[in-house]
Amino acid sequence: MKNKELNILLSAPRGFCAGVERAIEIVEKSIQKYGAPVYVRHEIVHNKYVVDDLKNKGAVFVEDLEEIEDKSRPVIFSAHGVPKKILEDAKNYNMTYVDATCPLVSKVHREAENLNKSGYHIILIGHQNHPEVIGTMGQLPKESIDLIQNEDEAKNYDNKENKKIAFVTQTTLSVDDTKEIIKILKNRFVNIREPLKEDICYATTNRQMAVKNIAKECDMFFIIGSKNSSNSVRLVEVAKKSGCSNAQLIHSESEIPYEQIGNSNVIGVSSGASAPEILVDNFISDLKNRFTIDIDEVEIIKENVIFKIPKKLN
């Protein structure tokens, strides 16, 4: 088997984005400053490897503030953002909290709030029950914001009260799918207000474009990331739509389906924005044990975005 040659096309950019790096650093610096345990409301980012690593360092993950028995301990809000009510609850409990919401998600929160204050009813394009969507919808009164998830919902959206409407989007959506939804809304509501700068973040866009760039050359495509990672799931969809029908999401090298790889000559590899590079390294190392590997990294753009952590942790 070792004699078989495999060409790996390594998609770049891939892996951690600036918002994820910032969120992880916030947890680590909080543990250094306050000691363990430091509580984190929801997984700081959607990756099991990252969450397990932070647990080992002293982070305790909870879904509700009520689960924290010792309210004198600090709590961190995840990169996905939280509804306003959660911030109010933390203040009412007199808790020390650190907000690790990605600055690009916070930008969407501010947009939605400002547009609503200017008299607009808000449409959020996103996936129901995703923490980021819950957080964005939780910035406004329930009656001021509606969720649209797909083209059908955009076609059937009823602005029966003829309100002024504006849209914002989740930051981790499929760029192409979202374009189609926006096109439908603009055709139906000619005066709909859109964000000054699109809400899908730079990292989501870059990773999707990088995958799209090489997918048609690949017999198989592996996206390394967790099943609950929205941006990782979107990368699988992009690979399939861009010419590689056998695209799969795997968490780690332990999930490599070797029985399928035997017939492949070219394998594409990328990773979600919450997946550390060590998972890609482990994936390639495992393949090297069985095949003769030739690796080509195909980079479409350099990323140099850095987000500062809160001053209180410096």
Predicted regions and their residues:
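The feature marks the mature, well-folded catalytic cores of soluble enzymes
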Residues: 1-267, 271, 277-314
